């Protein structure tokens, strides 16, 4: 079910590639970062409850005190913020090799990962492609997906920089899109955070819109926000409700 890439990648080269991408953020990325951090950051909301009979004396309530009222105090209230978890799923099928699509996806993932790290949001990154195995019966044919764990839940970003730097070396094989998305949705739905977001980066080559509608219904049922980023293709826009397309990393800042 999983593909190991550690033995095949050159760690030093991959770490340098990661560093080169991080050191060259697209112009305007700061605005994207600010908007995403605002969405994801967990902040407690602090307020005050007035007209209390105990607590901190409310100086604005002196008029009520003069008329004999006892509810002249206020209390500090803290509303616990929503917490977020993010899963990033990368299409590593053979079509992503065309036109440097996988490299664009790699750049998007690395910059997105840095934003999530700064926001202190737990996240994972994995790629998917076929394993060469298929399941058949009288009603359907399904390709078994294989996943590439670039970053698992709980791992620090610093510990996986080489793996993220190796993303562009991992494209090949078929596209088990439906089964991979279902697996990723089920995985993030088990997280304890109140807000769950699944990003999929794909060229959507060969995707069937009707299948993706079923995936969207599943995401809605599980309470997961599904966001597609089309890579060098607008096909993702036809397949997913929340979607956009980029041809270059600079468009991420748009």
Briefly describe each language-model feature range:
Residues 1-254:
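Acidic, glycine-rich A-domain
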């Amino acid at each position: 079910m999983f593909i190991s890439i550690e033995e095949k990648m050159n760690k030093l080269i991959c770490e340098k590639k990661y560093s080169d991408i991080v050191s060259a953020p697209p112009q305007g990325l700061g605005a994207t970062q600010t908007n995403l951090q605002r969405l994801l950051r967990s902040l407690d909301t602090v307020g005050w409850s007035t007209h209390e009979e105990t607590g901190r004396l409310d100086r604005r309530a002196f008029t009520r005190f003069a008329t004999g009222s006892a509810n002249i105090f206020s209390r500090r209230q803290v509303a616990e913020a929503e917490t977020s978890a993010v899963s990033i799923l990368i299409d590593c099928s053979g079509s992503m090799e065309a036109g440097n699509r996988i490299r664009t996806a790699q750049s998007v993932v690395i910059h997105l990962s840095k934003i999530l790290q700064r926001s202190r949001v737990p996240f994972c990154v994995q790629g998917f492609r076929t394993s060469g195995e298929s399941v058949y019966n009288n009603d359907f044919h399904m390709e078994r997906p294989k996943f590439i764990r670039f970053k698992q839940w709980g791992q620090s970003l610093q510990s996986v920089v080489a793996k993220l730097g190796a993303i562009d070396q991992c494209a090949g094989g078929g596209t088990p899109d439906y089964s991979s998305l279902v697996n990723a949705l089920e995985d993030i739905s088990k997280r304890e955070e109140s807000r769950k977001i699944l990003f999929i980066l794909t060229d959507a080559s060969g995707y069937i819109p009707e299948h993706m509608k079923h995936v969207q219904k599943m995401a809605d049922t599980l309470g997961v926000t599904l966001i597609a980023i089309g890579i060098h293709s607008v096909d993702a826009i036809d397949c997913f409700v929340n979607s956009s397309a980029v041809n270059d990393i600079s468009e991420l800042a748009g």
